[in-house]
């Protein structure tokens, strides 16, 4: 399967596609808003996930400098990344230079740093389409500058569309048994 996946990735690249990292485990990589626990996951899980992506995915699809934050959860607030942000430093050390979060509060924004570009993206999925379609306040519609969601949303789709990030995403994984523990 890995060999076939690598061939597919190469075909996509040959056709002009840019591939990106969306992490290995789709974890909340970034800030939590809790002053006692500023990040959603531990540093160890952050480093492990980043390394697993490099070892398990990058080896198949080739190098990329684009990082699309899982769940849109950025590693910093709106202020520019700094050398003190060790998560940014680690991602940069892995070759990432373009960072994309999810921020539907504005049509778009871009931040250019000394050696990175950071931008918001809008998620165009079934959940966002549904939310935009049922929103009655025109000022709160997030996609109306692109299209009328009610013209795209399939009326045969079950509604309401709900979203859950799941219960296990930020839990500490079970400890692995090593040979020395057996």
Model-derived segments and their meaning:
Residues 1-15, 27-28, 63, 75:
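Active-site beta->alpha N-cap acidic-glycine motif
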Residues 22, 26:
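Histidine-centered divalent metal-coordination motifs
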Residues 30-182:
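C-terminal active-site subregion of NodB/CE4 polysaccharide deacetylases
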């Amino acid at each position: 399967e890995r060999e076939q996946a690598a061939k597919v990735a190469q075909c996509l690249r040959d056709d002009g596609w840019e591939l990106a990292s969306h992490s290995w485990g789709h974890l909340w990589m970034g800030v939590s808003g809790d002053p006692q626990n500023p990040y959603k996951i531990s540093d160890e899980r952050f480093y492990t996930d980043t390394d697993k992506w490099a070892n398990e995915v990058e080896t198949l699809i080739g190098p990329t400098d684009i990082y699309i934050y899982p769940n849109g959860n950025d590693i910093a607030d709106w202020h520019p990344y700094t050398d003190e942000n060790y998560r940014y430093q680690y991602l940069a050390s892995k070759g990432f230079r373009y960072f994309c979060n999810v921020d539907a509060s504005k049509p778009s924004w871009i931040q250019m740093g000394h050696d990175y570009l950071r931008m918001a993206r809008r998620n165009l999925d079934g959940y966002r389409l549904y939310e935009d379609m049922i929103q009655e306040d025109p000022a709160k519609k997030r996609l109306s500058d692109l299209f009328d969601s009610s013209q795209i949303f399939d009326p045969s789709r079950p509604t309401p569309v709900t979203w859950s990030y799941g219960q296990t995403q930020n839990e500490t994984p079970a400890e692995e048994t090593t040979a020395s523990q057996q």
